[in-house]
Amino acid sequence: MGSKSYPTVSDEYLAAVGKAKRKLRGLIAEKNCAPLMLRLAWHSAGTFDVSSRTGGPFGTMKNPGEQSHAANAGLDIAVRLLDPIKDQLPILSYADFYQLAGVVAVEVTGGPEVPFHPGRQDKPEPPPEGRLPDATQGSDHLRQVFSAQMGLSDKDIVALSGGHTLGRCHKERSGFEGAWTSNPLIFDNSYFTELVSGEKEGLLQLPSDKALMADPAFRPLVEKYAADEDAFFADYAEAHLKLSELGFAEE
């Protein structure tokens, strides 16, 4: 990854970011929607394609066309929940706002503090469908999407997978049902402790989760994060930051 050169934003813009943060904390507490907000931020950013420099965290998820992509089922709910806050803060880009929602979602559920740099500009065109990871696939597919397409590392893949500590799968959205951990509203390393301890009645393991244990490069990272939550939090914050800034502020 090249070094970053962040744009300068006005004091008024920074004040709007602060206000958005407070309002997002309130919304997420009231609606228990941290998992949904993290998914919105991830799915917005995870469309980035290194070779064509298209897609990425640039606010296109507000477009109903992108919300209708199969991988984004249910994200129309996130957009709708966020609209009343966004309406109060017209100066903010959707791009910054959706990524800020993901950062706040991790913070308020007890996860690490992910740095946030404002200044993303909204792009008009949504990316083509089919760039997000498919949960039914294995490690080759994960590397194709995260490494070849997005430019992230093996460590980023495993750390970001740990974000599944939040939330659950819904049959009507993904075809899968259930939560990964026994407390889906707390951000901790239990995704990894569950993976290492094997399958349990009532908890979900997707094919893409099992792939982490089967892969010789991924598995040591899973075991490290299961044993050391601080190491997971440090690597997660770095990976989330990278994901949230794909295609943004690059030299």
Curated annotation (Swiss-Prot):
Entry's cofactor comment: Binds 1 heme b (iron(II)-protoporphyrin IX) group.
Q: How is its activity regulated?
A: Inhibited by p-chloromercuriphenylsulfonic acid (CMPSA).
Which Gene Ontology CC terms are recorded?
chloroplast
| EC code | 1.11.1.11
Q: What molecular function terms (GO) are annotated for this protein?
A: heme binding; L-ascorbate peroxidase activity; metal ion binding; peroxidase activity
Region described as Disordered: spans on this chain: 113-137
Binding, heme b: 164
Organism equals Oryza sativa subsp. japonica
Residues under site feature: Transition state stabilizer: 39
Q: Which domain of life is it from?
A: Eukaryota
GO biological process entries: cellular response to oxidative stress; hydrogen peroxide catabolic process; response to reactive oxygen species
Q: Which gene produces this protein?
A: APX2
Function (record text): Plays a key role in hydrogen peroxide removal. Plays an important role in plant growth and development by protecting the seedlings from abiotic stresses through scavenging reactive oxygen species. Required for pollen viability.
Q: What positions does UniProt annotate as the active site of this protein?
A: 43 (proton acceptor)
Reproduce the miscellaneous comment text: Binds one cation per subunit; probably K(+), but might also be Ca(2+). Plants over-expressing APX2 have increased ascorbate peroxidase activity and exhibit enhanced tolerance to salt, drought and cold stresses.
Similarity-based family: Belongs to the peroxidase family. Ascorbate peroxidase subfamily.
List, as start-end ranges, the regions of compositional bias called Basic and acidic residues: 119-132
Name assigned to this protein: L-ascorbate peroxidase 2, cytosolic
Please report a single Pfam family linked to this protein. Answer: peroxidase
- Gene3D superfamilies in the record: 1.10.520.10, Peroxidase, domain 2
Q: Does the keyword Ribonucleoprotein apply?
A: no
Induction notes from the record: By stress and hormones. By infection with rice blast fungus (M.grisea). Circadian-regulation. Expression is higher during the light phase than during the dark phase. Induced by salt stress. Induced by heat shock. Induced by hydrogen peroxide in leaves. Induced by drought and cold stresses.
Name the catalysed reactions. L-ascorbate + H2O2 = L-dehydroascorbate + 2 H2O
On tissue specificity, the annotation reads: Expressed in aerial vegetative parts and reproductive organs. Expressed in roots, leaves, stems and flowers. Expressed in young leaves, internodes, blade ears, stems and anthers.
According to the UniProt record, activity depends on pH as follows:
Optimum pH is 6-7.
List keywords of the entry alphabetically.
Answer: Calcium, Cytoplasm, Heme, Hydrogen peroxide, Iron, Metal-binding, Oxidoreductase, Peroxidase, Potassium, Stress response
Places the protein is found: Cytoplasm
The UniProt disruption phenotype note reads: Semi-dwarf plants, yellow-green leaves, leaf lesion mimic phenotype, abnormal anther morphology, defects in pollen viability and seed sterility.
